[in-house]
Amino acid sequence: MMKFMTEDFLLSTSTAQKLYHDYAEEQPIFDYHCHLNPKEIAENRQFNDLAEIWLEGDHYKWRAMRSAGVEEHLITGSADKYSKYLAFANTVPKCIGNPIYHWTHLELRRPFGITDTIFSPETAEKIWHKGKELLQQPEFSARGIMKKMNVNLVGTTDDPIDSLEYHKAIAEDNTFDVEVVPSFRPDRAFKIELPLFNDYIEQLGKVADIEINTFDKLKQALSKRIEHFDKYGCKSADHGMEIVRFSPIPDEKTLDQILQKRLNNQPIEEEEIAQFSTALLVWLGTEYHKHHWVMQLHIGAIRNNNTRMFKLLGADAGFDSIGDRAFAESLSRLLDSMDQTDQLPKTILYCLNPRDNEMLGTMIGNFQTGGIAGKIQFGSGWWFNDQKDGMERQLQQLSQLGLLSQFVGMLTDSRSFLSYTRHEYFRRILCEMIGGWVERGEAPNDLNLLGKMVKDICYDNAKRYFK
């Protein structure tokens, strides 16, 4: 019987252990997509206790607590922090089999060094006091944790109207050498169907100092914001796409009419929504290509399913799930529309429904280009798939349908400074898979060859890709 979470956690063969400890473990973290608050990095937030650093904004943990029957006031409500922490401590033993159980114990080990204790209601008080003591120390501030976890870069997720004042402050601070760059997230600009679209266009116009009343003026405003983001080191643009729409792009006059209808609060048809979003996304893609940015498409979530809780808590509170809309043909035509003019940017495709893994695994091969290794990527297991089984599926299907050796690897996609252990989780799973190939005679026992592949996937490929 193996002990719980030893140094060889998830590594069942000697080859896997060598690959992880000799090649993967010490690689820096290039976290190219996350939802950290740049203000907390700029101000080097010092968290007071484990409730703050663990439970604020972490909808993974919130969902688990709700599933365990915890009352909402102990999750997102008015209860004191220690009571919320104890409610989580009571939930964790019920999470065996869920990735939260592994993540929680990995987060205790790194960065806190708590390796000899299983988190439970019985150990909660001891761990609370230990965590509180450590969190008062400078090396456990937001920046301190990033340094302890060997983070090289983080890419935050930012709206085009953001001033990027905190990114500017971080870049000008010579005492901090972790690169913190913005990522351009224009969802509210291309989703013309959103209820608050008109309000957003007004805000965008003010920030860009342009009155947006035509499609060309909208492009001008977004172009100015792209230049603003580029100035502060932006390397990527991210897009959340519940639905992948495609329609042949109409002439500018038709696009102006669609925009005017929407700005005048007139109803627009589904075909008009598709025409508008296609036109704007294709144009945005060519802009990203011009600036050498990476385009990321996160596809397939159903968001804000619970109307009552959405009204109470707003978005991103743990009430989203996996969608099942088909999108292969529309995605292919969208990418092809950019590629026809040789202006398709480097692109990472993520699906929330694992049913679509093989489809994306083959889709990326349609648009690869000489001179850019792995130009089009099948992204790491996202959201409900960034757990052991989901990561294994994505890695296996990418290796079978594409080139695993060119993969840009893991990202946290998280709002928590403790989520860097997800890179460790991924690296262990990667090394276990490759080590298993060697043990079964499916790959050569060449640690130089495989070790370089592991290092590339863990760090070097992403470092080269996002430049």
From Swiss-Prot:
One of its GO terms (molecular function) is glucuronate isomerase activity. Pathway: Carbohydrate metabolism; pentose and glucuronate interconversion. Pfam families: UxaC (PF02614). The keyword Transcription regulation does not apply. Keywords: Isomerase. Its EC number is 5.3.1.12. Signal peptide: none annotated. SUPFAM superfamilies: Metallo-dependent hydrolases (SSF51556). Belongs to the metallo-dependent hydrolases superfamily. Uronate isomerase family. This is Uronate isomerase. The gene is uxaC.
